[in-house]
């Protein structure tokens, strides 16, 4: 009997990766500044915008929350990721459907969908989910892959393991027998990059902003501090998604 699970929980979670630029001449303790940024983000997470059905993550508000923490902060580059938890039926054949309710950003090279690790029947090595976009950029194949540590290559274990609908924001994993998960409680975290940084929880999706799994990198603004007025050597942070296989 093949079971079909529509979602594993009715919750979509935001997280951010933020590079916070600061003027080092105005900061005595960088760790304290980082803590203050984290606390400010947690306060926003607890606000009326979020942690509810139909919630909305407001990107511009998050940028302002970070910038307003301290006058030493000069700017921030913040990337948004969304995830849902897939609770696997261990050692049982099952199909899984994860609805994010937000359109996905599509890089034609793939790696738009990422996951934490798991194992499947007849494959002892840790595997991951990823996507192979179709030429139309609207849909793609969901693939199960594994990294080859010796060569740095990614090997396809199952090339057609399901479907990704980038427009609807859906990930469908067809009949698969999962034997274990790297995370506790049989959980596989499945991540995507939203097309819009304003993320909306549809009426049947509970939206949370997970600050605990967000990344805050403090970066010295060498132009503002006067160290490198010309801008040569200034550390630039990309605003776009990366091509890594695993969910970070």
Predicted regions and their residues:
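An aromatic-glycine-centered, glycine-rich loop/turn in mixed alpha/beta architecture
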Residues: 26-124, 128-132, 246-247
